[in-house]
Amino acid sequence: KSNYSNEVNEKIRSVEELEVYQNEGLVESTVNDRTVLKDTSINPDLIDEKGRTNLERMEKGLAPIDENGKPYNLHHIGQNADSPLAELKDGVHKKNDAILHDKSKPTEVHGENSSVNWDKERSEHWKARAEEIKAQQNKGV
């Protein structure tokens, strides 16, 4: 059973895909007017190989890293350019590749015909998430 909205559930293709998001504890929210399944366990203080914290990375528009030093992926649920996004650890995204991606249909997201400037959108997502984290820290949450 899914606790996610109809918008998210309509894009999820299988129980296995739903379980990927649920097992990661992803929480539905909105970032920059887009529905997102957020990983609330991102550690803002984790430091990358260049000495930057995750919060500093995100402020620059870079994806945060997980405990293995790998950057998070923003996965388009349903593989449409306007799909809800899921913040997934790199290892989770790779391990569940066949569950998360329908290889029988072309993706709208990263293809040459995509009208979306994905690099810019991804960067704006992480900047907005940095602002959320700073606001929570200021509240003492």
Model region roles, listed by residue range:
Residues 1-72, 78-141:
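Nuclease and nuclease-like effector domains acting on nucleic acids or nucleotide cofactors
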